[in-house]
Amino acid sequence: VESGIAKGVDALLKYKGKKLYIWAVYSLGLITRNDGEREYNPHFDRRHNVNFVTSYKFGKNESWKTDIRWNLGSGFPFTQTQGFYENLTFSDGINTDYTTANGDLGIEYADLNKGRLPYYHRLDASVSKSIKVNKKVNIDMTASVTNAYNRENIFYFNRVKYERVNQLPIMPSFGASITF
């Protein structure tokens, strides 16, 4: 049975005006687990996290709106690779010719979750327009972009292929909704 401790603190600033909304939060957290053999930081332990959100309404009848969200987070823990070795299976028992046999790739790991991935950050933005067709029908159109400056945030590292796998690239999107 594992046990653990999670502790942290948040600082929040918020402004809400007629046209402008601003929200900023900083979170400091520390999570540790103990599996009976060792204490370690789990893979979701993010020490520092900053979110900044702003929304602004403008235009005739405030029918236009822009939204921006920026997020910065310290890297998650991961277990580093110390090295590789050939892991022979000895499938023929004592008769296995280890001089010509091809083994599987074995990985030598460092201590559990002692490494940290690089910091994560991205900017998402959108602009939307609301069109009131009549008293009962409204059309909302939105254009948005996720990861606006195309930050290459790491998702994980493929140890076998020795290849970095990133999270979302820049992703534009468009949408519309009709309410009645």
Positions of the model-derived regions?
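Short, surface-exposed alpha-helical recognition segments that flank or form part
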Residues: 1, 114-115
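Gram-negative outer-membrane beta-barrel transporters
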Residues: 1-77
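Extracellular loop and loop/strand-boundary signature of outer-membrane beta-barrel proteins
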Residues: 8, 34-41, 110-114, 159-164
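Sequence-level detector for tyrosine residue identity
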Residues: 15, 21, 26, 40, ...
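C-terminal beta-signal and adjacent terminal beta-strands/loops
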Residues: 71-104, 116-124, 128-180
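Short glycine/proline-rich turn/loop motifs
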Residues: 104-110
